């Protein structure tokens, strides 16, 4: 996959790939206020516990923590953990809702990116990993590191 020079990663959910097995990815816009945009551009957001839910034919992002902007007054600042609307096409919402309801999967944000001036969320359709799957992933990562160390040492 080629790297797009117009896309800059602002915040990444590094824990998601460890906690979940990512099956599919989607890109969605997010409905934000001005102070939220300023905070996210500054990297002051946390995707750790965030997830998407579907209600009334709309997709909503819950538990995305966006820190209040420092220079804005309390009156004009936003609620840090409010739910935010995800902007997806109808067929994408229907497909994601079907996957979540039928197969017991979940939708988690993987990262927030700045794409040509717009903040987008990369969403992953995910299945939770069991403890032994996580241990297996750690073992594989360690063996890859050791092999790379050996090759580098030669």
From Swiss-Prot:
Keyword vocabulary terms for this entry? Cytoplasm, RNA-binding
Entry-linked InterPro entries: SmpB, SsrA-bd_prot, SsrA-bd_prot_CS
Does DNA repair show up as a keyword for this record?
no
One GO MF annotation is: RNA binding
Primary residence = cytoplasm
Q: Enumerate the subcellular locations listed in this protein's record, separating them with semicolons.
A: Cytoplasm
Looking at the UniProt entry, the stretches that span the membrane are: none
Q: Which Pfam families match?
A: SmpB
Give an example GO biological process. Answer: trans-translation
Q: Which GO terms describe its cellular component?
A: cytosol
HAMAP family reported for this sequence: SmpB
Function field: Required for rescue of stalled ribosomes mediated by trans-translation. Binds to transfer-messenger RNA (tmRNA), required for stable association of tmRNA with ribosomes. tmRNA and SmpB together mimic tRNA shape, replacing the anticodon stem-loop with SmpB. tmRNA is encoded by the ssrA gene; the 2 termini fold to resemble tRNA(Ala) and it encodes a 'tag peptide', a short internal open reading frame. During trans-translation Ala-aminoacylated tmRNA acts like a tRNA, entering the A-site of stalled ribosomes, displacing the stalled mRNA.
What does the sequence similarity comment in the record state about its family? Answer: Belongs to the SmpB family.
Query: Would you tell me the protein name for this molecule?
Result: SsrA-binding protein
* Protein's organism: Synechococcus sp. (strain JA-3-3Ab)
The major lineage groups are: Bacteria, Bacillati, Cyanobacteriota, Cyanophyceae, Synechococcales
Give the gene that encodes this protein. Answer: smpB
């Amino acid at each position: 996959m080629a790297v797009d020079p117009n896309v800059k990663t602002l915040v990444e959910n590094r824990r998601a790939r460890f906690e979940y097995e990512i099956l599919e990815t989607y890109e969605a816009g997010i409905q934000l206020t001005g102070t939220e945009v300023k905070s996210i551009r500054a990297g002051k957001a946390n995707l750790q516990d965030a997830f998407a839910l579907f209600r009334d034919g709309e997709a909503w992002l819950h538990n995305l923590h966006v820190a209040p902007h420092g220079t804005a007054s309390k009156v004009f600042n936003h609620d840090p953990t409010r739910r935010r609307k995800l902007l997806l096409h109808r067929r994408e919402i229907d497909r994601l809702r079907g996957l979540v309801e039928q197969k017991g999967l979940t939708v988690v944000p993987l990262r927030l990116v700045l794409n040509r001036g717009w903040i987008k969320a990369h969403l992953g359709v995910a299945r939770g990993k069991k403890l032994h799957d996580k241990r297996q992933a750690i073992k594989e990562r360690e063996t890859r590191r050791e092999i790379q160390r050996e090759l580098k040492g030669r």
